[in-house]
Amino acid sequence: MRFIPLLLVFSLFAQDDVGAPPKSGTTGSIGTVTLNGQVYNQLSIRPEIPIGKLGVGLDIYLYFNDEGMYWDSWDFSSGGSAYKTIIDKIYYLRWGQPGDNLYFMAGALPSVTLGQGILVNNYANIMEYPQVRQVGLNLQAKVAGFGIELIHSNFKSATPGVLGIRGSRTILPKLSLGVSFVTDLDQLAGLPDSDGDNYPDYYDYYPDDENKWDDYSSNQSLYDHHFEFYKEAHPNATLEEFLNEFTVTKSNYSPENATKDPISGLAIDATYTLSEKMTLYSQFGLLQGEIVDPEDNTKTINPGWGLVPIGARAKLGPINLLAEYRMGSRRFVFNYWDRAYDVNRVFVDASGVSTRESQLYLYGKLNGFYVQADMSVMNLFTLSSGYQYMKGEKWDKDLNKYETGETNKTFLSTISINPSLIPRVEKAEAF
């Protein structure tokens, strides 16, 4: 099943802050999916049912095309099928709100930030939903004067893309310190595996058959026997040459011997609350992993570090402002675990399989600023825009070295519109 989001996404969150976890309300989306080779329209309504501090988020969806409805996702023919159908419609479970003594959201995580966000900022485990349905957890608790936060992006995987923990404590009346640790135990685990046979599609000649991944393994003894006869006429032939001549596929991937490619990050931050509407902070982040040295590909090197010596958050009427001065060493990118992390965690290109970490060499020493503004206008729409301008080094693939005087600019903007004429709809977002 493949999900292709449209530019228009209805988000009916009963909330004020852009990107904040949803409070009681209704969300929804429209789009298209491909099921068994057929394209269907998708209509999804996501209400939240509040029960005291508990919120149960549901995902009630329909697939249809010009030939009719797709009912396989609404199967009540047996007890087991009915149970699977009902469980499949639970989008998340929520207890309390961020800032409470105990808060958690389990299931879909639409937006999670750890600390001030130098490592994990606005992460979402729903970017490939419903093609990939992850069951994550964001837990926040206050215990004996300490703040504790936990992020787990997917309990359905032994190697989730985001596994993070943070501890914080107020050391002075308005000053708090925090320490965060984040890891991706194996970036390569993000490769798609459509049939769940532990052979990623990239290495699987039969990606939709859970019992077969190549021709050779399905009847290895037979092919080995024929190869012995083949060698009598071709004594210097290899097994691969024999299989290629007779177009017999053989995957060189082995789940038992597959190497893992982890990456981790450590962050420290200090936050000073000037008032209810303004906060100052400083944060430092360090990535730990192993990438090929672009200047000598026989060596491996560690990723780098980033520093925000001063940052500020402020609320001015309907406007929420954020500003940071950023400094980064080579091989560091701010907000490494961002909203799109699950999408670019690992990818396949002309050179083969590459990870997000492997591309860090493209970033040289950079200094600059980042600003963001969220503005609500007469409760009609909310505009959120972020801009980063960094200057310094950038890797030049043609010259095979870092060039100075280069810039790195990024811009992201979203708009949320309140369609008051639509019953029960509180917000619609366009990206």
Model-based region annotation:
Residues 1-4, 274:
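Positively charged n-region of N-terminal signal peptides that target proteins for export
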Residues 19-23, 38, 68-70, 101-103, ...:
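Signature for the C-terminal beta-barrel architecture of outer-membrane proteins
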Residues 15-46, 346:
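Short glycine/proline- and aromatic-enriched beta-strand/turn motifs that initiate or cap beta-hairpins
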Residues 87-103:
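Gram-negative (and chloroplast) outer-membrane scaffold detector with strong preference
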Residues 63, 109-110:
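Acidic, small-polar-rich N-terminal luminal/periplasmic segments of exported/outer-membrane proteins
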Residues 56-92, 119, 292-293, 299-300:
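Surface-exposed loop and membrane-interface regions of Gram-negative outer-membrane beta-barrel proteins
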Residues 47-56, 97-101:
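Short, solvent-exposed loop/edge-beta patches enriched in aromatic
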Residues 3-13:
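Sec-dependent N-terminal signal peptides
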